[in-house]
Amino acid sequence: MIGKLKGTIDEIGEDYVLVDVHGVCYVAHCSARTLSKLGSAGEACVLFIETYVREDQLKLFGFMTALEREWFNLLQSVQGVGAKVALAVLSTLTPSELANAIALQDRAAVSRAPGVGPKVAMRLVTELKNRAPAFAGEAINIALKQELGEGVAAAPVADAVSALTNLGYSRDQAANAVAAAMKTAGDGADSAKLIRLGLKELAR
Protein backbone atom coordinates (compact mmCIF):
# COMPACT_ATOMS: atom_id res chain seq x y z
CA MET A 1 0.00 0.00 0.00
CA ILE A 2 1.12 3.56 -0.68
CA GLY A 3 0.90 5.80 2.40
CA LYS A 4 2.61 8.99 1.24
CA LEU A 5 3.98 10.47 -1.98
CA LYS A 6 6.91 12.88 -2.11
CA GLY A 7 7.76 14.21 -5.53
CA THR A 8 7.18 17.03 -7.96
CA ILE A 9 3.94 18.16 -9.55
CA ASP A 10 3.71 17.11 -13.19
CA GLU A 11 0.14 18.20 -13.86
CA ILE A 12 -2.95 19.35 -11.99
CA GLY A 13 -6.35 18.37 -13.37
CA GLU A 14 -9.90 19.16 -12.34
CA ASP A 15 -9.95 16.58 -9.56
CA TYR A 16 -6.46 15.09 -9.51
CA VAL A 17 -2.76 15.82 -9.40
CA LEU A 18 -0.08 13.91 -11.28
CA VAL A 19 2.95 13.48 -9.01
CA ASP A 20 6.33 12.57 -10.47
CA VAL A 21 8.30 10.40 -8.05
CA HIS A 22 11.73 9.64 -9.52
CA GLY A 23 10.33 9.37 -13.04
CA VAL A 24 7.21 7.41 -12.13
CA CYS A 25 4.00 9.47 -12.25
CA TYR A 26 1.13 8.73 -9.88
CA VAL A 27 -2.42 10.02 -10.27
CA ALA A 28 -3.84 11.12 -6.91
CA HIS A 29 -7.47 12.22 -6.73
CA CYS A 30 -7.88 15.15 -4.32
CA SER A 31 -10.44 17.49 -2.87
CA ALA A 32 -10.70 20.93 -4.45
CA ARG A 33 -9.33 22.38 -1.22
CA THR A 34 -6.20 20.22 -1.41
CA LEU A 35 -5.66 21.01 -5.09
CA SER A 36 -5.91 24.73 -4.35
CA LYS A 37 -3.09 24.46 -1.82
CA LEU A 38 -0.69 22.72 -4.20
CA GLY A 39 1.88 24.67 -6.16
CA SER A 40 2.45 24.70 -9.89
CA ALA A 41 3.98 22.13 -12.24
CA GLY A 42 7.58 21.45 -11.33
CA GLU A 43 7.18 22.34 -7.66
CA ALA A 44 7.68 19.84 -4.85
CA CYS A 45 4.68 18.33 -3.09
CA VAL A 46 3.93 15.86 -0.33
CA LEU A 47 0.61 14.05 -0.12
CA PHE A 48 -0.78 11.58 2.38
CA ILE A 49 -2.31 8.76 0.38
CA GLU A 50 -5.28 6.46 0.81
CA THR A 51 -4.99 3.51 -1.58
CA TYR A 52 -8.09 1.81 -2.97
CA VAL A 53 -7.60 -1.58 -4.56
CA ARG A 54 -10.44 -3.07 -6.56
CA GLU A 55 -10.57 -6.05 -8.87
CA ASP A 56 -10.28 -3.88 -11.95
CA GLN A 57 -8.39 -0.83 -10.67
CA LEU A 58 -6.01 0.74 -8.18
CA LYS A 59 -6.92 4.28 -7.19
CA LEU A 60 -5.01 6.80 -5.07
CA PHE A 61 -6.55 9.63 -3.07
CA GLY A 62 -4.26 12.43 -1.87
CA PHE A 63 -4.50 14.71 1.16
CA MET A 64 -2.47 17.59 2.58
CA THR A 65 -2.68 16.20 6.13
CA ALA A 66 -3.12 12.83 7.79
CA LEU A 67 -6.13 14.30 9.60
CA GLU A 68 -7.90 15.05 6.31
CA ARG A 69 -7.25 11.46 5.24
CA GLU A 70 -8.78 10.18 8.49
CA TRP A 71 -11.88 12.28 7.92
CA PHE A 72 -12.09 10.90 4.37
CA ASN A 73 -12.26 7.38 5.78
CA LEU A 74 -14.62 8.31 8.60
CA LEU A 75 -17.06 9.95 6.20
CA GLN A 76 -17.23 6.79 4.12
CA SER A 77 -18.29 4.76 7.14
CA VAL A 78 -21.70 6.41 6.74
CA GLN A 79 -24.20 4.63 4.51
CA GLY A 80 -24.52 6.28 1.11
CA VAL A 81 -21.18 8.07 1.30
CA GLY A 82 -18.49 6.94 -1.11
CA ALA A 83 -15.13 8.38 -2.08
CA LYS A 84 -16.66 10.96 -4.44
CA VAL A 85 -19.04 12.37 -1.84
CA ALA A 86 -16.38 12.28 0.88
CA LEU A 87 -14.07 14.37 -1.33
CA ALA A 88 -16.94 16.76 -2.07
CA VAL A 89 -17.51 17.28 1.65
CA LEU A 90 -13.80 17.90 2.23
CA SER A 91 -13.79 20.30 -0.72
CA THR A 92 -16.54 22.31 0.95
CA LEU A 93 -15.60 22.12 4.64
CA THR A 94 -12.26 22.09 6.43
CA PRO A 95 -11.78 19.37 9.08
CA SER A 96 -12.48 21.92 11.83
CA GLU A 97 -15.62 23.18 10.05
CA LEU A 98 -16.78 19.61 9.56
CA ALA A 99 -16.17 18.82 13.24
CA ASN A 100 -18.13 21.94 14.17
CA ALA A 101 -21.02 21.02 11.86
CA ILE A 102 -21.24 17.54 13.37
CA ALA A 103 -21.04 18.83 16.94
CA LEU A 104 -23.82 21.35 16.26
CA GLN A 105 -25.82 18.87 14.14
CA ASP A 106 -25.70 21.46 11.35
CA ARG A 107 -27.14 19.57 8.40
CA ALA A 108 -27.29 22.72 6.29
CA ALA A 109 -23.51 23.18 6.45
CA VAL A 110 -22.87 19.59 5.36
CA SER A 111 -25.49 19.69 2.61
CA ARG A 112 -23.59 22.54 0.92
CA ALA A 113 -21.28 19.87 -0.48
CA PRO A 114 -22.17 18.75 -4.03
CA GLY A 115 -23.95 15.41 -4.03
CA VAL A 116 -25.00 15.62 -0.38
CA GLY A 117 -28.77 15.76 -0.08
CA PRO A 118 -30.84 16.24 3.10
CA LYS A 119 -30.98 12.52 3.92
CA VAL A 120 -27.24 11.98 3.56
CA ALA A 121 -26.52 15.15 5.52
CA MET A 122 -28.79 13.90 8.31
CA ARG A 123 -27.02 10.54 8.40
CA LEU A 124 -23.60 12.21 8.45
CA VAL A 125 -24.25 14.48 11.42
CA THR A 126 -26.24 11.82 13.30
CA GLU A 127 -24.01 8.78 12.80
CA LEU A 128 -20.75 10.65 13.30
CA LYS A 129 -21.81 12.66 16.36
CA ASN A 130 -20.37 10.17 18.84
CA ARG A 131 -17.50 9.00 16.64
CA ALA A 132 -15.94 12.31 15.66
CA PRO A 133 -14.78 13.93 18.97
CA ALA A 134 -11.22 12.61 18.72
CA PHE A 135 -10.96 14.03 15.21
CA ALA A 136 -12.62 17.27 16.30
CA GLY A 137 -10.06 18.05 18.96
CA GLU A 138 -7.14 17.68 16.58
CA ALA A 139 -8.94 19.60 13.85
CA ILE A 140 -9.56 22.49 16.23
CA ASN A 141 -5.94 22.53 17.38
CA ILE A 142 -4.76 22.70 13.77
CA ALA A 143 -7.28 25.42 12.93
CA LEU A 144 -6.14 27.51 15.89
CA LYS A 145 -2.50 27.19 14.88
CA GLN A 146 -3.27 28.13 11.28
CA GLU A 147 -5.38 31.11 12.33
CA LEU A 148 -3.31 32.47 15.22
CA GLY A 149 0.18 31.03 14.82
CA GLU A 150 2.11 28.07 16.18
CA GLY A 151 2.18 29.47 19.73
CA VAL A 152 -1.54 29.06 20.34
CA ALA A 153 -1.13 25.67 21.96
CA ALA A 154 0.58 27.38 24.91
CA ALA A 155 -0.92 27.40 28.41
CA PRO A 156 -3.24 30.48 28.32
CA VAL A 157 -5.12 29.34 25.23
CA ALA A 158 -5.30 25.71 26.31
CA ASP A 159 -6.45 26.74 29.80
CA ALA A 160 -9.11 29.05 28.39
CA VAL A 161 -10.48 26.36 26.06
CA SER A 162 -10.50 23.87 28.94
CA ALA A 163 -12.30 26.31 31.25
CA LEU A 164 -15.03 27.02 28.70
CA THR A 165 -15.59 23.32 28.03
CA ASN A 166 -15.88 22.77 31.79
CA LEU A 167 -18.67 25.35 31.76
CA GLY A 168 -20.62 23.13 29.38
CA TYR A 169 -19.62 24.46 25.98
CA SER A 170 -18.45 22.01 23.34
CA ARG A 171 -14.75 21.95 22.52
CA ASP A 172 -15.30 23.47 19.09
CA GLN A 173 -17.49 26.26 20.53
CA ALA A 174 -14.84 26.98 23.16
CA ALA A 175 -12.00 26.94 20.64
CA ASN A 176 -13.82 29.26 18.26
CA ALA A 177 -14.59 31.69 21.09
CA VAL A 178 -10.98 31.67 22.31
CA ALA A 179 -9.71 32.20 18.76
CA ALA A 180 -11.91 35.30 18.51
CA ALA A 181 -10.75 36.42 21.97
CA MET A 182 -7.11 36.07 20.93
CA LYS A 183 -7.70 38.37 17.97
CA THR A 184 -9.15 40.98 20.31
CA ALA A 185 -6.70 40.60 23.21
CA GLY A 186 -3.46 39.89 21.36
CA ASP A 187 -0.75 37.29 21.94
CA GLY A 188 0.12 38.37 25.48
CA ALA A 189 -3.32 37.82 27.01
CA ASP A 190 -3.59 35.59 30.06
CA SER A 191 -6.16 32.81 30.42
CA ALA A 192 -8.49 34.88 32.63
CA LYS A 193 -8.81 37.57 29.99
CA LEU A 194 -9.31 35.00 27.24
CA ILE A 195 -12.04 33.31 29.27
CA ARG A 196 -13.81 36.61 29.89
CA LEU A 197 -13.66 37.64 26.24
CA GLY A 198 -14.56 34.13 25.15
CA LEU A 199 -17.70 34.20 27.27
CA LYS A 200 -18.67 37.49 25.66
CA GLU A 201 -18.29 35.89 22.24
CA LEU A 202 -20.42 32.92 23.26
CA ALA A 203 -23.11 35.20 24.65
CA ARG A 204 -23.63 36.95 21.32
From Swiss-Prot:
Residue ranges, annotated region (Domain II)? 65-143
Membrane recorded as keyword: no
UniProt organism field:
Rhizobium etli (strain CIAT 652)
* Primary residence: cytoplasm
Q: Which domain of life is it from?
A: Bacteria
Subunit relationships: Homotetramer. Forms an RuvA(8)-RuvB(12)-Holliday junction (HJ) complex. HJ DNA is sandwiched between 2 RuvA tetramers; dsDNA enters through RuvA and exits via RuvB. An RuvB hexamer assembles on each DNA strand where it exits the tetramer. Each RuvB hexamer is contacted by two RuvA subunits (via domain III) on 2 adjacent RuvB subunits; this complex drives branch migration. In the full resolvosome a probable DNA-RuvA(4)-RuvB(12)-RuvC(2) complex forms which resolves the HJ.
Entry-linked InterPro entries: DNA_helicase_Holl-junc_RuvA_I, NA-bd_OB-fold, RuvA, RuvA_2-like, RuvA_C, RuvA_C_sf
Q: What is this protein called?
A: Holliday junction branch migration complex subunit RuvA
Q: Which sequence ranges are marked TM in the entry?
A: none
Please give the function described in this protein's UniProt entry.
The RuvA-RuvB-RuvC complex processes Holliday junction (HJ) DNA during genetic recombination and DNA repair, while the RuvA-RuvB complex plays an important role in the rescue of blocked DNA replication forks via replication fork reversal (RFR). RuvA specifically binds to HJ cruciform DNA, conferring on it an open structure. The RuvB hexamer acts as an ATP-dependent pump, pulling dsDNA into and through the RuvAB complex. HJ branch migration allows RuvC to scan DNA until it finds its consensus sequence, where it cleaves and resolves the cruciform DNA.
Q: What is known of its domains?
A: Has three domains with a flexible linker between the domains II and III and assumes an 'L' shape. Domain III is highly mobile and contacts RuvB.
Where can this protein be found? Cytoplasm
Q: Which GO terms describe its molecular function?
A: ATP binding; four-way junction DNA binding; four-way junction helicase activity
Chain residue ranges for the region called Domain III: 152-204
Q: Name one Pfam family in it.
A: HHH_5
